[in-house]
Amino acid sequence: MDGDCIVILFGAGVYAKKYKALLEYLNMEFDYFTDNDSSKWTMKLYGKPVIPPSRLKQFPKCKIIISSTHEQAIRKQLAEMGLADKIMSLEELYHLCGQKMTKTDRSGLDITVRDNVTVLVDMYEGIGWGGTELWAAGLAFGLKSAGRNVLLIGGTEQPSLEARYETLTIRITEQDTIMHMVELMEQNLPCIFINNFAGCAFMAAIIVKKKYPDSMHIVSVIHNDNPSLFDAHMMLSKYIEKIFCVSSQIREHMQEQYVMPNQCCYFKEQPIETDILREIRPDTQVYDVLRLGYAARLVRQQKRADLLIEFIKCLEERGFDYIFQIAGEGECGDMIMDYVRHHHLERKVELLGRLPKSEMQAFWKRQDIFINISEYEGTSLSMLEAMSCGCVPVVTDVSGAKEFITHGENGYICDIGDLKMMAQYVASLDNERKKLASFGRKCQIIIKERCNPEEYIKYWIKNLLN
């Protein structure tokens, strides 16, 4: 590329990281980010200024790389600005990656294609303890237990996992990320890459696939029903052999949006260990305080933890006694704690912080009701874990809810944001303790019948890994 050419990344959001890593792999410097969000125009990201899109016309010699899932909208915007010819596509970047691999001396690497297939499970972009990472770790461990060669790809900045998962994990640093991932994948050919985040590891897998098309297969997993996540995975769909969706609703949406054939798109109910089930409280114990449980990242995006304060207000308006235990950490934690202290609700609302996975079963066995106020989900693992312990779900109408909850029979599903109705259903369960017990038993039965871990791994081996 011309040394005088300015390189600009259009998109300063969560996907900027992987584009930065891709440019690092290519030894390509970039100069600016740009973004349509005006609140970012005074900030720097990875040391680079974020400028308004209106400034792009100031650079007659520039290349613009769209580092956002809103690719089509941004392409249209740039075309209307007369800058369509400045766009550098991902395909162009991958072509450069292919040239780099051809020129790079690989003599020091053992890239002999072996007989045994290695399954590489992507966990790199996650925070280390979110639902996607725990799902990835569980899948890897299950496949390893079934005799498959498996590695988890994680980051050095993530917290350590349980020992049984950590022994399967290769930690990649943020320096030269994609280069190290490419080398790891080459050393483990042939391999199947399980794409969970459409991030740096996905880019590395595509680079390897372009050079070894018969020895690298990619399976993409869609973990929630956010359309932007669909786009992040499907922008490079020609490199993907199969799609796995964590709910049947997501599969339906994917097939509608992308006209995908059934043989490419799969779904199986999430696995939950149900060997130790809670003994549900007898119907006669009607005087115990009702216990509510919430376990998720305390963040606004997706989880809408900022609405927990409003939900607590709605509970208080109902005038019944309860204990609401909140397990998690994040940007909304201090705000919730301040509200609880200011209104002297410490006896009713307890913030426990993030609990390790090993303590979650005990947490749910203490609760009567599972609360979820998310704006979108895949299939909530917390919900399934809680239901397996006999907790009655009172949740928003997100993906996966209707697959396990029949409204009014084993739980309640409310419109997204309808906190008053959620509080009303909680109050009704407080008044009808027999219903609380019967709903809880039904929850345990459906999880035991449909979420068998062994069957889940068999399904993956038969349908996704062959």
Where are the predicted features?
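Conserved donor-binding/catalytic core segment of Leloir-type glycosyltransferases
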Residues: 118-120, 283-303, 309-312
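A conserved mid-protein helix/loop that constitutes part of the nucleotide-sugar donor-binding site
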Residues: 133-138, 299-314, 331-337
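Short His-centered aromatic/hydrophobic patch
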Residues: 195-201, 222-225
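A short, active-site helix/loop in glycosyltransferases that binds the activated sugar's phosphate group
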Residues: 230, 238-264, 272-274
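Nucleotide-activated donor-binding/catalytic signature segment of Leloir-type glycosyltransferases, i.e.
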Residues: 337-354
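Short alpha-helical donor nucleotide-sugar binding micro-motif in glycosyltransferases
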Residues: 354-355, 362-367
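Aromatic "clamp/platform" in nucleotide-sugar-dependent glycosyltransferases that forms part
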Residues: 375
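Short hydrophobic beta-strand element within catalytic cores of glycosyltransferases
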Residues: 392-395
